[in-house]
């Protein structure tokens, strides 16, 4: 049996950094990544046969828990009929119809294979439909790794984009304005200066890539209003929050209709599926109807779509989201109580089946605030919990996820471990 360390050494010889997505490398927390060989319900097992309670959940898709038998059966049955056709299928039509039925803002849907593809296409579509070049995104919001969205904010109220990744020429992001999340005044100022040139605003309506940051009161409605006023496209990136925080995502909770929505994660049930959808007049600009090109060999893959359909059927059961939110709240309430009892500066927040943990006195509202958290305390907490069989995301800037299989016994086992960890941290 290979150890995690042996596998990581081996991986580093054939894969850059030993991983196929950077956060998996444990660089921000140190130590050796756990190589997972199987998962079931709320648990994952590594190559050393150590079991962990899992709050990563494949970074969000595993809302039903890992390897739900109905989803696995749907994948098995679809695979028996063929893995990929490169042609239209009944199942992809059914998935599009389900998404349109569930989300009132969707009139038409285009399936892709990832969240990055969905957001990249949504930006291109907004630019093509409006004939404008500039886009607004927010500091700390992640929308995949396409060039125009790999931007961080600089100083000043209105900041023209600077690359935040090597290999992205400055001119590629020169039309990207990066503003502070939850700062509506900055958005209004940007439109006052550049309104005729702004194609769209793209936002995580609840940010999940700078830990969990909720929108301030009036922020999302303000974005809706300013986009409507200036004829810009409002894009809700619900890749993470779609069907994770409620049956209609954040847009349903907030009562706001974006013009375009991007989806992934839950809608694939653990398989690679993404989607963008929205107003029919905008979607009509996509090829083959319009001049905005988008294509994909595996878009609408029948096996992945089968997993998505099975998942969406199961999460539509009455009471599903109420129970999911209750379990998530049980976790965050319990962690807060135990940290307080130990005298550890700690805050937690939750929405639906998502949560954020912060080693600071209050819940942050921006990237700057979340960055002020105690990074060393998080590292100590992460490794101590991992040693006690609890698997959180290996970064202080990632949200966590609860599944339908995280019952009271699982949550309470997590809290027992946390109580011991907080006590040790204080001591």
Swiss-Prot record:
Its cofactor is pyridoxal 5'-phosphate. Its main location: cytoplasm. Its EC number is 5.4.3.8. Pathway: Porphyrin-containing compound metabolism; protoporphyrin-IX biosynthesis; 5-aminolevulinate from L-glutamyl-tRNA(Glu): step 2/2. Keywords: Cytoplasm, Isomerase, Porphyrin biosynthesis, Pyridoxal phosphate. The modification N6-(pyridoxal phosphate)lysine is found at residue 265. Pfam families: Aminotran_3. Gene3D superfamilies: Aspartate Aminotransferase, domain 1 (3.90.1150.10), Type I PLP-dependent aspartate aminotransferase-like (Major domain) (3.40.640.10). GO terms for molecular function: glutamate-1-semialdehyde 2,1-aminomutase activity; pyridoxal phosphate binding; transaminase activity. It comes from the Bacteria. InterPro entries: 4pyrrol_synth_GluAld_NH2Trfase (IPR004639), Aminotrans_3 (IPR005814), Aminotrans_3_PPA_site (IPR049704), PyrdxlP-dep_Trfase (IPR015424), PyrdxlP-dep_Trfase_major (IPR015421), PyrdxlP-dep_Trfase_small (IPR015422). One of its GO terms (cellular component) is cytoplasm. GO terms for biological process: protoporphyrinogen IX biosynthetic process. It catalyses: (S)-4-amino-5-oxopentanoate = 5-aminolevulinate. It is found in: Cytoplasm. PANTHER family: GLUTAMATE-1-SEMIALDEHYDE 2,1-AMINOMUTASE, GLUTAMATE-1-SEMIALDEHYDE 2,1-AMINOMUTASE 1, CHLOROPLASTIC-RELATED. NCBIfam families: hemL (TIGR00713), PRK00062.1 (NF000818). Belongs to the class-III pyridoxal-phosphate-dependent aminotransferase family. HemL subfamily. Homodimer. This is Glutamate-1-semialdehyde 2,1-aminomutase. The lineage of its organism: Bacteria, Pseudomonadati, Pseudomonadota, Betaproteobacteria, Burkholderiales.
């Amino acid at each position: 049996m290979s150890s995690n360390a042996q596998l990581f050494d081996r991986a580093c010889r054939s894969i850059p950094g030993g991983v196929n997505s950077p956060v998996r490398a444990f660089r921000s927390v140190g130590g050796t990544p756990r190589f997972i060989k199987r998962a079931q319900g709320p648990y994952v097992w590594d190559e050393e046969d150590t079991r962990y309670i899992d709050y990563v959940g494949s970074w969000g898709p595993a809302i039903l828990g890992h390897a739900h038998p109905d989803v696995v059966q749907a994948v098995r049955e679809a695979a028996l009929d063929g893995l990929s056709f490169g042609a239209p299928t009944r199942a992809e039509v059914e998935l599009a119809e389900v998404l349109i039925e569930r989300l009132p803002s969707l009139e038409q849907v285009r399936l892709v294979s990832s969240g990055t593809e969905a957001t990249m296409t949504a930006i291109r579509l907004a630019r093509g439909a409006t004939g404008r070049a500039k886009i607004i995104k927010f500091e700390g919001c992640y929308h995949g790794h396409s060039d125009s969205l790999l931007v961080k904010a600089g100083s000043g109220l209105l900041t023209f984009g600077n690359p935040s990744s090597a290999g992205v020429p400055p001119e590629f992001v020169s039309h990207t304005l990066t503003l502070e999340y939850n700062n509506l005044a900055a958005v209004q100022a940007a439109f006052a200066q550049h309104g005729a040139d702004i194609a769209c605003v793209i936002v995580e309506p609840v940010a999940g890539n700078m830990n969990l940051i909720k929108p301030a009161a009036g922020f999302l409605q303000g974005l809706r209003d300013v986009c409507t006023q200036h004829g810009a496209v409002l894009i809700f990136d619900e890749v993470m929050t779609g069907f994770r925080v409620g049956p209609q995502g954040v847009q349903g909770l907030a009562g706001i209709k974006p013009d375009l929505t991007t989806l992934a994660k839950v809608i694939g049930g653990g398989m690679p599926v993404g989607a963008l959808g929205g107003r029919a007049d905008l979607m009509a600009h996509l090829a083959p109807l319009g001049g905005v090109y988008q294509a994909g060999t595996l878009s609408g893959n029948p096996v992945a779509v089968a997993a998505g359909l099975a998942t969406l059927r199961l999460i539509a059961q009455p009471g599903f989201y109420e129970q999911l939110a209750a379990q998530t709240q049980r976790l965050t309430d319990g962690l807060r109580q135990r940290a307080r009892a130990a005298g550890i500066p700690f805050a937690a927040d939750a929405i639906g089946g998502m949560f954020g943990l912060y080693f600071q006195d209050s819940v942050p509202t921006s990237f700057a605030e979340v960055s002020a958290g105690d990074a060393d305390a998080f590292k100590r907490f992460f490794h101590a919990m991992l040693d006690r069989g609890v698997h959180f995301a290996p970064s202080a800037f990632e949200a966590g996820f609860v599944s339908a299989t995280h019952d009271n016994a699982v949550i309470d086992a997590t809290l027992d471990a946390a109580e011991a960890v907080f006590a040790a941290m204080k001591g």
